[in-house]
């Protein structure tokens, strides 16, 4: 099928037919299959304009796939304006559902990557974030986004000598599942788990994709990942500062959700917890630190006074979460 036939097929599709096509097709390949010819028709532009003109015909899955198609590869200024139009196609809880759908990708092209990396026009980015903020105003989802470190929090990796390296900590996956389902086991959304790591982002997303693959092998099928940079590996304070910045981005993307942070005592996560309590006290309900360095009782008590709760096991973490009404009794 040549480029003109692709455009004709999509242009003639019924609303339900177009939605079905955009749900099933690899949108990045679709956009790569057409071109703006130097001495011929500008078919890629025509494809983008056609799909943007029919945003009202598309469901959340199709809209998220369209945004991915515009995001993957080179994203020019017209693509970025089209991405902004995708966000404007939804309001209220409909926008929340669309953002969650966008964030379900299993590669580096998630919501944070879309808004804060691929959209590099600050005016367009502010337009997107302004729409998100306006639609979240007064919106009460009543759920939490769980933000978690990885090394020595989910997987024994660096400082902990109690388990073989690579061990998934007992109870951590069950706790993530309970937090995802919430206190009533009837959540508005599932997949509300995001990993905040100091591991650097690279241009091709290879490190992030490797991290996601490792998490899937550990039994975590759906999650998003917020990465750091090489400079942030220099010190624990720089690691912590990057994590707090990533969480600031995340809160800007999901202002209608409350937040919970789970980290460990080995790599600056206590500093992250302090930063969250300082800057996001209005939405952060709990900071839990998994102890891997034998934190003394006096220090634990002092941290608890700051709102940072140190635990030895994920049974202890679950008790803290239940006390705060974050998980059900089941």
Per-region residue spans from a language model:
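Glycine- and small hydrophobic-enriched segments that form the cores of compact globular domains
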Residues: 114-224
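A short, conserved beta-to-alpha structural element at the edge of catalytic cores
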Residues: 174-186, 282-318
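Divalent cation-coordinating acidic motifs and surrounding scaffolds
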Residues: 165-167, 192, 200, 228-232, ...
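A charged nuclease-like catalytic/ligand-binding cleft shared by nucleic-acid processing domains
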Residues: 207-253
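Conserved Lys-Pro-Asp/Glu-containing loop-to-beta segment of HAD-superfamily phosphomonoesterases
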Residues: 255-266
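Short, basic/hydrophobic alpha-helical segments
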Residues: 176, 180-184, 243-257
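A short acidic (Asp/Glu
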Residues: 157-159, 204-210, 269-276, 297-300
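Non-catalytic pre-domain segments flanking phosphatase-related domains
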Residues: 1-148, 327-330
């Amino acid at each position: 099928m040549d480029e003109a036939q692709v455009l004709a097929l999509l242009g003639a599709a019924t609303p339900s037919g177009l939605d079905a096509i955009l749900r099933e097709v690899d949108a990045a390949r679709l956009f790569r299959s057409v071109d703006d010819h130097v001495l011929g028709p500008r078919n890629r532009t025509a494809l983008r304009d056609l799909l943007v003109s029919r945003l009202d015909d598309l469901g959340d899955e199709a809209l998220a796939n369209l945004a991915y198609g515009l995001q993957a590869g080179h994203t020019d200024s017209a693509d970025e304006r089209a991405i902004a139009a995708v966000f404007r196609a939804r309001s209220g809880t409909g926008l929340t559902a669309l953002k969650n759908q966008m964030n379900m990708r299993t590669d580096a092209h998630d919501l944070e990557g879309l808004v804060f990396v691929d959209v590099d026009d600050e005016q367009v980015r502010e337009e997107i974030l302004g729409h998100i903020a306006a639609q979240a105003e007064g919106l009460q989802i009543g759920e939490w986004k769980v933000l978690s470190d990885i090394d020595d929090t989910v997987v024994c990796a660096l400082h902990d000598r109690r388990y073989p390296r690579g061990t998934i900590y007992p109870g951590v996956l069950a706790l993530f599942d309970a937090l995802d389902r919430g206190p009533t086991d009837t959540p508005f959304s599932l997949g509300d788990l995001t990993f905040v790591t100091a591991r650097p982002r690279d241009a091709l997303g290879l490190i992030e994709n490797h991290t996601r693959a490792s998490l899937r092998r550990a039994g975590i099928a759906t999650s998003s990942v917020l990465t750091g940079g090489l400079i942030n590996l220099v010190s624990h304070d720089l690691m912590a500062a990057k994590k707090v910045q990533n969480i600031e981005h995340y809160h800007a993307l999901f202002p209608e959700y409350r937040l919970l942070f789970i980290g460990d005592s080995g790599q600056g996560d206590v500093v992250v917890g302090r930063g969250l309590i300082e800057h996001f006290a209005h939405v952060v309900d709990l900071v839990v630190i998994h102890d891997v360095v034998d934190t003394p009782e006096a220090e634990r008590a002092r941290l608890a006074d700051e709102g940072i709760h140190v635990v030895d096991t994920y049974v202890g973490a679950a008790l803290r979460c239940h006390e705060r009404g974050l998980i059900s009794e089941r």
